[in-house]
A protein has these predicted regions:
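Short, flexible helix-loop junctions that flank or precede catalytic/ligand sites
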Residues: 1-290
Length: 290
């Protein structure tokens, strides 16, 4: 990591101090000196309810195949949510779970499952190489830390299509934006085929952001989209822009828009109206509901 830092001017890595904690570090050069941002990662993964992760999100780990995406801006808790999904599978199923991460964050002990954790640039060259290799390593579940390019996305969808559960993340906000982003990565002459494939393998998109509560602590707000025949048809027919409306008006307990999630937190007295307006996607509609 030091060699990479000196060579490139920045690097990400993680390390542990026994008996204390784990740390994720982003180091970089600035004005001729070195700087670092360090985040604490506990050895023991907190329970989902302690983190404010809804049961609907945790239960996405019940899928045995397909693609589940957790999205949101940097530092919004995506890795923690994915780690909770992995931990639930590890605790309840006899599976082989392969995680591909850059860097490794939470360390998973073998419980009912076997968990193989591979760190990019240390245990393997890159995400694409590791993902292709994982398909030959008899996985039931693959955690792909990030889908960074079209080849990795294509391979991840193929893995999901061939009977594996693939969990991954993107730096997008909202289910419709996430789906559009995936399709737009590909060349125009491939987008129709990719949309059809995505409509078949995608199981759910969870978008999250951390927002301040009335006590000044950061709590998560979630948008949850689970695949339905209507949404599948919208993806296939290039009507992705209509998905937000389906989520917003959904009466299903396992589907909620970001704005309705924020409204629920406001009505519960957990956030202020100013916070709800700041983080919502439709301020005009939110003002009316507040």
């Amino acid at each position: 990591s030091i060699d990479l830092l000196l060579q490139r001017g920045d690097d990400d890595f993680s390390f542990s101090i026994p008996g204390l904690s784990r740390y994720r570090v982003s180091t970089y050069k600035q004005r001729g000196s070195l700087a670092a941002v360090i985040r604490v990662i506990t050895f023991e993964l907190p329970k989902p309810d302690e983190l404010g992760i809804p049961d609907t999100v945790v239960q996405l780990s019940d899928y045995t195949k397909g693609l589940v995406l957790v999205t949101g801006p940097a530092g919004s808790g995506k890795s923690t949510t994915l780690a909770c999904l992995v931990d639930r599978i590890n605790s309840t199923k006899s599976d082989h779970i392969i995680t591909l991460e850059d860097p490794l964050e939470f360390l998973h002990r073998h419980k009912k499952s076997i968990v193989s954790q591979r760190e990019i640039s240390i245990d393997t060259e890159n995400y694409l190489v590791a993902l292709r290799a994982a398909l030959r390593q008899s996985p039931d579940v693959i955690l792909l830390g990030e889908m960074r390019d079209y080849e990795t996305i294509q391979t991840a969808m193929t893995a999901a299509e061939t009977g594996h559960l693939v969990l991954s993340s993107l730096h997008t906000i909202g289910a419709a934006n996430t789906i559009s982003r995936i399709i737009d990565v590909f060349e125009p002459n491939q987008q129709r085929q990719i949309a059809v494939q995505l409509s078949m393998v995608l199981k759910a998109v969870v978008s999250q952001q951390l927002i301040p509560d009335t006590n000044g602590r950061m709590i998560p707000a979630f948008e949850i989209m689970v695949m339905t025949p209507a949404i599948s048809n919208m993806i296939r027919d290039n009507k992705v822009h209509q998905i937000d409306g389906i989520i917003y008006t959904s009466a299903k307990e396992d589907m909620i828009s970001m704005d309705n999630s924020l409204l629920g937190l406001y009505k519960a007295g957990r956030i202020t109206s100013e916070t709800a307006l700041r983080y919502c996607t439709n301020p005009e509609m939110m003002r009316k509901k507040l």
